[in-house]
Structures are given as structure tokens and as C-alpha cells.
A protein has these predicted regions:
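Beta-lactam-recognizing serine transpeptidase/beta-lactamase-like catalytic domain environment
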Residues: 2, 6, 13, 17-82, ...
Length: 251
């Protein structure tokens, strides 16, 4: 009985406090930048709010503490975490702070800064790894070191957080993290970290992005660098089906 009620959305998993309580997903065609799907959960039936509004249904949405009218794909900003490491690897390789063949030993605990952050695998270690292996294994220690090198000019000067963040900001901007994506609905502005570059190098510090912003970035990685300005529209037609306007993602 209960499964059938949930299947028919008479009762939602969110109302029963079943995980996941909230989530979002954005799917794109990386070759063209087309947004194929943009989903926020929990959601609602828009048909019941079109033309004649179902007042009781609308009131239930307003009172629902799981916030079904809140678009988690475009409005919820969170730290990108390890997904951000591709930005850092690109910056490190391009600016010469790391090289493809260089191997860095993961010592578990990074002692070059005062809070001594640890790799996720600590007290174990990834051993000596290069940049591709560090991305594969999501080695925090490797990227702590990369962020530290950016902040010291490859150990040529004392630690300077502004120096490190400026490098990361430059490359984050190249991947489109300095602007919204172009979609035609409400979207929170992204925030590129402006402090703690060693932590920013693993997608922490005060980095904050929405799911759709992360999708645009990953799309650019997958297609070798094209950052698209997204659209949720395909075309506008009149009542007779004549196409009045078409929309395409722009680079």
C-alpha cells in the first residue's frame, strides 16, 4: 500500500524523511552544450498550477518543509569538493607548478600550513603519484601541495595566500565560474574562493557553485575547453506551429 502511494506521488519520499531528501541533476550534450535534463528533487506538478490554479495543492507546496518549489539545480550553492581538482590540475600544469611526469609523495598529513589538513586516505597514503594518478585517486595531499606551490611561487617566496588564490581564480574564470550559465530561470551567482588557497585547491575554502554551474564546467573539460552559455529553450512557435525563434547554446 505504502509503495503504491509513493509511486503515485500521493506521498513523497521527502514527506517520509527517506533519503535522499533533496538533490539535483543536470545532463548535457558535451559536444553541443545542449541541456538535455535539469532536475530538482523534490519537485511539483506544474500542470496543477497552470491556467486554473489548484489552490489546495499550491498551499500544500507553500507549507512543505522539503521546499519543492526551490530549484536545487540552480539555486543551491555548495562547495564543489574534489570535482574542482581538474581546475587546479589545469592551472598547475599551465603555470609550471607541477609537470606531467613529476611524482609527489603523499605523506598523509600536510604540514606546510598551520591547520595541517589530511588526505582523505589518512592514516594510509597514496604513495608517490603523478597528476593523472592524483586525479584518479582524488589525492588531497597532491593538491594541497599544488595550492601551496602556487602560494609561494614554487617555493621562491614566503607563503602568500593572495598569490595562490589569484592563480586559482584565473583558471576558475576560464572554466566559466565567474558568471552564471545563461539559463532563463533564477540562478544563484557562483563564488570563486578568495582565501585559503591550499584548501581551495581541493574544492573547499569558500568556493560555492550550483549543480548547473558544475555541469557547465565538466562539459568544458569533456569537450577540451568550450565553455557554453546555456539555454533551456529550443524554439518558440505560434499557434499554427510556425517557428518564430530558435535557441542554441553559445560559446
Amino acid at each position: 500500500f505504502l509503495k503504491e502511494r509513493i509511486k503515485n506521488l500521493d506521498i513523497t519520499p521527502a514527506q517520509l524523511a527517506l533519503d535522499p531528501c533533496a538533490g539535483s541533476c543536470v545532463v548535457t550534450d558535451v559536444r553541443t552544450g545542449e541541456v538535455l535534463a535539469l532536475v530538482s528533487y523534490p519537485g511539483y506538478d506544474g500542470n496543477r498550477l497552470a491556467n486554473t490554479v489548484d489552490a489546495a495543492y499550491f498551499e500544500s507546496l507553500q507549507n512543505d518543509k522539503s521546499l519543492p518549489q526551490y530549484n536545487y539545480a540552480t539555486q543551491q550553492s555548495t562547495a564543489p569538493g574534489s570535482t574542482y581538482k581538474m581546475v587546479v590540475a589545469t592551472a598547475g600544469l599551465s603555470e609550471g607548478y607541477i609537470t606531467i611526469g613529476e611524482r609527489i609523495r603523499d605523506l598523509g598529513e600536510y604540514e606546510n600550513i598551520s591547520n595541517k589538513p589530511k588526505c582523505w586516505i589518512y592514516p594510509s597514503s597514496h604513495g608517490e603519484i603523478n597528476v593523472s594518478e592524483a586525479l584518479r585517486d582524488s589525492c588531497n595531499y597532491y593538491f594541497y601541495e599544488t595550492g601551496f606551490r602556487m602560494s609561494t611561487g614554487n617555493y621562491s617566496t614566503s607563503y602568500n595566500a593572495e598569490l595562490g588564490t589569484s592563480v586559482l581564480q584565473k583558471y576558475a574564470s576560464m572554466f566559466g565560474f565567474d558568471e552564471t550559465t545563461g539559463i532563463e530561470i533564477v540562478e544563484n551567482s557562483p563564488r570563486i574562493a578568495d582565501d585559503f588557497p591550499v584548501m581551495a585547491a581541493i574544492g573547499q575554502s569558500n568556493n560555492n557553485y550550483t549543480t548547473v554551474q558544475l555541469a557547465r564546467y565538466v562539459t568544458a573539460v569533456a569537450n577540451s575547453g568550450n565553455v557554453y552559455r546555456y539555454t533551456l529553450l529550443n524554439r518558440v512557435e505560434d499557434a499554427d506551429g510556425n517557428v518564430l525563434m530558435t535557441y542554441e547554446p553559445e560559446i
